[in-house]
Amino acid sequence: MSYYAFEGLIPIVHPTAFVHPSAVLIGDVIVGAGVYIGPLASLRGDYGRLIVQAGANIQDGCIMHGYCDTDTIVGENGHIGHGAILHGCVIGRDALVGMNSVIMDGAVIGEESIVAAMSFVKAGFSGEKRQLLIGTPARAVRSVSDDELHWKRLNTKEYQDLVGRCHASLHETQPLRQMEENRPRLQGTTDVTPKR
């Protein structure tokens, strides 16, 4: 893992969290219990404090950064999709930020909300509970349905289960030269296949 002290501040990572070895955590970063931090994630606590609360996940290639005297927060059971950028914002409890979305300074995403993939949330946006936000700039189009929230929670549970799976079996290795006979397929712990 790449952990760096900065001006006397050392990242804090709960022992039950999983941080991928290629992720980088710098300075004032606090990672809670059962959190998943994916490959190539960058959490730069060299200006403001970054807080990832219990059960949240920060997926591959995500960036978290902030500015002085502020906290950038991902709330409990927050779900941050691949490639998302969070800058000086607050993501509410049980909210989802879709892949490659950008959430700007001072924005607040309400709890149980969903930000659609590729959305841009402007600085200072103040969201309410359980909103579906879509677009560039993002706007609330309706409330998140019970089915959508259930789907989000199943996906978050997959990442919470992945923490233990990674602790138990993830290790660096050399690649095989060919596919072995009867190669098994990996299985998740819940069925999160998108409905068409």
Curated annotation (Swiss-Prot):
Keywords (A to Z) from UniProt: Repeat, Transferase
Family annotation (Pfam families): Hexapep (PF00132)
Domain of life of the source: Bacteria
Keyword Transferase among record annotations: yes
UniProt GO MF annotations: transferase activity
Pathway the protein contributes to: Amine and polyamine metabolism; carnitine metabolism
GO process terms (BP): carnitine metabolic process
Compositionally skewed regions (Polar residues) per UniProt: 187-196
Region (Disordered), start-end ranges: 173-196
NCBIfam families on file: PRK13627.1
Purpose: Overproduction of CaiE stimulates the activity of CaiB and CaiD.
Family classification: Belongs to the transferase hexapeptide repeat family.
HAMAP family assigned to the protein according to its UniProt record, in alphabetical order: CaiE
Protein name according to UniProt: Carnitine operon protein CaiE
Gene: caiE
